[in-house]
């Protein structure tokens, strides 16, 4: 992790073009015999939930450098979600990992805008489409047309609330 040194703007993490857990385990939760995306197809090269693991390592090594998540894993886990592998509802990957920002969906345009705004430190990042970040309720200014999702705690108490959240996310994509 230290070989390339401190980045000028941020660390970007994407565990690959396929969900890491689907790539690593079968539907019966058995370890797959090979991994098409690692050298020599070795199935033991990546940890479970690599976005979380890699972010936590980078935050320990470079606590002041922003970490931006992207890819299918970040997109699908940006809000409270059901985790098949642990058979429970999990918090947003932003909470679990400690990342600063998340780009969801097709990220080519948002990442270019994110870089532009990181270069010009005066510009706000929170108005870029397809960017997710954590903030305090008191810091959030609601606008007309915003969709309010249920909190993780509310989803744990009522599975219909989690289903409603998921519906909004699916319709957004």
Give the location of each predicted region.
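Glycine-rich beta-alpha loop elements in corrinoid/cobalamin-binding modules
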Residues: 1-173
């Amino acid at each position: 992790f230290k070989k390339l040194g401190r980045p000028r703007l941020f660390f970007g993490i994407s565990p690959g073009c396929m969900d890491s857990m689907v790539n690593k385990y079968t539907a019966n939760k058995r370890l797959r015999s090979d991994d098409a995306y690692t050298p020599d197809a070795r199935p033991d090269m990546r940890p479970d939930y690599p976005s979380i693991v890699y972010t936590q390592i980078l935050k320990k090594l470079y606590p002041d450098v922003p970490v931006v998540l992207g890819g299918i894993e970040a997109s699908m886990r940006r809000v409270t979600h059901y985790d098949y592998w642990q058979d429970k509802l999990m918090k947003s990957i932003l909470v679990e990992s400690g990342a600063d920002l998340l780009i969801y969906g097709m990220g080519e345009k948002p990442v270019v805008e994110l870089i532009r705004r990181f270069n010009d430190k005066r510009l706000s990042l929170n108005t870029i489409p397809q960017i997710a970040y954590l903030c305090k309720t008191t810091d959030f200014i609601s606008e007309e047309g915003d969709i309010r999702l249920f909190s993780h705690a509310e989803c744990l108490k009522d599975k219909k609330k989690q289903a409603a959240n998921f519906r909004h996310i699916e319709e957004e994509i």
